[in-house]
Amino acid sequence: MNLKKAWLVIPAAAALALTACAGGGTTSSGSGDKVVTTNGTEPQNPLLPGLTNENGGGKILTVLFSQLVRYDIDGTAVLDVAESIEPNEDASEWTIKLHNDRKFSDGTPVQAHNFIKAWNLITSKQQQQAAFFSIFEGTDDEGNGEITGLTEIDDYTFTAKLKNPTSDFMSRLGYVAYAPLPDSTLADPDAGGQNPVGNGPYKMASADAWEHNVKFTTVPNENYVGDTKAQNDGVTFVFYTSLDAGYQDLSSDSLDILDGVPASVFKTFESELSGRTVNQPYAGVQYFTIPQYLPHFSGEEGRLRRQAISMAVDRDTITKTIFNGTRTPAKDFTAPTLEGYDANISGNDVLTYNPEKAKELWAKADAISPWDGTFTIGYNSDGGHKEWVDATANSIKNTLGIDAEGNPFADFKSLLDAEDKREMTGAFRNGWQGDYPALYNFLQPQFATGADANKGDYSNSEFDSLMIQASSATTTADAVKTLQKAQTILLQDLPAVPLWYPNVSGGWSKNVDNVQFDWKGQPVLYKVTKK
């Protein structure tokens, strides 16, 4: 998801905060006194699975909905709403049988048509998550159109025909884009987006539980019968405008869980919150994207400038001094926690600080068209990004001898809206937190032609072909080989500049127990208990 993520993006796993103003109050609200509070951000869009591809909305949908499979804490896919998911001989057609006892929070049953119609809503309306359905028969290369490959066999069974054999199809189905929708939302998606009705372990606490720019309150879903039943009285997502304020609330035990701490406490948070912290790698990576539509950044000139800028960033120094070792310099576009990761991909020397080579490449670009102006990196001020953006801009400035600086946006939503409208006047920070644990998920949604998370409008036909080939691979080894070949193309073109792999660096209050963080750096909220 595109950190998609306000912080992870320092994606997704990272951080939210607000002083004691809008959203600053963290008093418990819900059905009881055992409500867990955690940080969040105001969702960019209505809370529908097809419209949500950023962390603010994604966190909330994760507790409101359950999919055909779910992911264990280590990222292993296990059956959830599905009783069985079976492929044919070449994995081009799958039969999905549902448990017959699952219900939405409004009491209606979760049936085959709730999946089929929900997925078709996404593709027929060309919603943001349509790209995840491009593998199905009937959709175009961008996942739009009617999914003719879905057939209802009976109330609790349906089949899915894919364009090509897809051996990892089942493991993808835990992503929230593949969630079902109740009949009420299918009949009125606008209403469902403002007052989501899901089939997960939690539900909206009330019709006004979404207090925009303040918080979103959930309570346990009494109709839920799956394996992730809430061990608390609900979860309230508090929308912060700064990481520092979130950390202040956490330190005073006014907030229960913060999944990202501000740069100002990287050196001290583990001692200040002794025994109540997490600092571990997860499936995420941070970049900054340089849009194709910017002057000086297309064609051969653009390729030279992108490589020069990448080599002008001193990742080692920044990760040590700004992040105090809670980040690791990136060697590719994915994450080292994923199967098939390779730190030695051909061409990744472009991700190593090399000031002399950077100057040489910049001079070659100037010979094509002289540079003028200021190189900027856009970022959201509510995500704790200023320190590293300033350090990165200074590294570029000092190496290349050009003006470079950060370009702050008030909040994550404002930044995303500008990206969506193609209104960026410079580069912009972004990142990725795995939707499901696979290399493919880090590459196709962000860099395939027309993909919704491809906010820089990158397009390379050879890369697109390799994505199709990787998706159709019959073994993981074959898929990995193809995906690493695709990464060599990205390392030449640098549609985004990989910076570092983040740790989830967070903490929890003295008021909660059983706090764990999963494979993508998110707290496992249903397990958390209040003292």
Explain the meaning of each model-derived region.
Residues 97, 131-183:
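Surface-exposed binding/hinge segments that line
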Residues 363-434:
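Ligand/substrate-recognition segments at binding pockets and active sites
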Residues 190, 196, 222-268:
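Ligand-site clamp/hinge motif
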Residues 39-89, 197:
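N-terminal lobe/hinge region of extracytoplasmic solute-binding protein
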Residues 328-365, 383-387:
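Structural transition elements
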Residues 166-229, 234:
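Gly/Pro-rich hinge or "lid" segments in bacterial periplasmic/extracellular proteins
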